[in-house]
Amino acid sequence: MSNNKKEIMKFYTMPETRAFLESIGMPGGDLYDLPTSEKRFPDGGQYRFEVPGIQGPGPMKALLEALDEYGIQIHRVTQTKGIMFLTDEEISKMVEYAKKWNVQLVLACGPRATTDTSASVKTEEGQRMGYRLRGEEQIARGIEEIRRGARLGVRGFLIYDEGLLWALNEARKNGFIPADCHFKVSAHSGHGNPCSAHILETIGADSINPIRDIQIQMLAAMRAAIDVPIDLHTENPKSSGGFIRHYEVPDFIRVAAPVYLKTGGSVAANHSYDTTEKEARQRAKQIMLVKRVIDTYYPEAVVSPKITK
């Protein structure tokens, strides 16, 4: 073999690529040794509970009352259809319930690819664009959504587009929206690796929801790259695969803390499903089932006190 070929083969070795990734502050690959995360929420907690897909005040109240009956606390309630689908009165009522039960309320930005006039997103190929926004007009409308929610007392917002996230972070820094606004990046943005998560963190994400089927070793690598909380689905609606990950939750907590455990999704048919009050109570039961797994297999795990920050 010529010296030239030897040099080429040496140059393209995987160890060098892994070393380069580590030199720029990223893990060199997925962390199969599953290291325990020492990172925590500010209160010292490793995990918090989140219930997604609560689209209005009726289901929200039913959920929180059912949780009281079970004696279980949660920390975050998330609406996914969009602020533009709620009246001012409905938003104000949800803010009222969030204060009464001391949970963080997260409302979704309404404008997205699936509600735009574009035909592309309805096609097999176009679906790959996810919920991302098309055109600057949609960015402006997205900012208006967040401003409206903020005026009504909302501070947590679910974001689907990286450009909108960046613009909102600039708005937050410049005082155009309240400085205490919290931006949660949706799993529908399609991120599933440490480098992507790092980008989201640098442009303003306060918590990141990776793709739903991310594996434990991938999750460990993501945690090594970022400090913000990671939001993880413990179960999923049929439209997202329908898989249940309850027995993986102890490992979620151990390798990825601080984490929000998104629970109750298996009750829904799809992402923007209108959960009924009866189904909201079923979601409360799912929280109890996940808590049982944690208490059995990782009893030393520390849950955050019931706070909203």
Language-model segments: which ranges?
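Active-site pocket-lining/capping segments in soluble small-molecule metabolic enzymes
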Residues: S2-V154, I159-H191, N209, I216-K309
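Short, glycine/polar-rich helix-capping loops at beta-to-alpha or helix-loop-helix junctions
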Residues: G192-S196
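Acidic/histidine-rich catalytic cores of soluble enzymes
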Residues: H198-E201
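Hydrophobic, aromatic-enriched interface-forming segments
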Residues: I203-D206
